Amino acid sequence: TEIARGNPLPSTLLLERVWNHRLQIAISRCNVLLQNVTLETPLIQAGGAYVSTEEKARWIAEAHFLRAFYYFDLMMIFANVPIIEESLNVIDKTTITKAPMEEVYDFIMKDLEVALAEENLPSAKELSADEFGRVTREAVYSFRARVALFNKDYALAKSDCKKVIDSGAYELIPNYEDLFNSVERGYMSKECIFMTYNSYNPPYCNGNPALIYFVGRGVTGGWGGEVPT
């Protein structure tokens, strides 16, 4: 209710969850990778083969993008936030201070520039089918355009959007309804630039596990009728 009234409080649980997830989990994981993985770091895959230098370079670029992605989300919600570039111990976490929005913006743009400078970051047309959902060059350009708009850098936003359009990797779906009713044409459509990829399991409440908590057992095998003692 505090958020709906435009008066969120520090005790608002939803905001606490967003803060913890973005800063303590997502950004922290990006920092762990950037701190510990270099092109020279020997890494072995599950099958026993070494991870190639090209793949490690791609991981690093993806981590820079994701860190920028989460920092922008934090900045839009909380304005001034602490800039953390490395893993922190318990003591360090108690002494960090917030940076002004201008510094956070510059930090975000720097991360995006690093990602775009990596030649091993592929374009959308270069992705294989099993890589759908990974960061692409067009995803970085699209996101940088969004960040630039919020900073009133309209020239950069226009330039980056044009790069995405000119890539030819995306197009509008003729039938708008297909975005919602067709897995093949909607979920993995040419309109999707960057998205979270989830498994689709029709028998499991048509792919939505939340339904089982709200419907009776006779409908979809849900748990809505369960009453714990």
Give the role of each language-model region.
Residues T1, V81, Y105, M109, ...:
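An aromatic- and glycine-enriched ligand-binding surface/loop that stacks and positions planar moieties
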Residues E55, W59, S128-V135:
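All-alpha amphipathic helical-bundle segments outside canonical DNA-binding/catalytic cores
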Residues E2-F78, A99-E103, A115-A124:
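Conserved, well-structured interaction surfaces
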Residues N89-V104:
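Flexible interdomain linker/hinge and immediately adjacent N-terminus
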Residues V37, E86-S87, T196-Y197:
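Active-site-proximal beta-strand/loop segments in catalytic clefts of secreted hydrolases
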Residues M75-I77, P82-I83, L88, S123, ...:
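Short coil/turn linking the two alpha-helices of tandem helical-hairpin repeats
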Residues A46-S52, E85-D92, L127-A129:
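Short linear capping/connector segments at secondary-structure termini
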Residues N7-S11, L88-K93:
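A short small-residue
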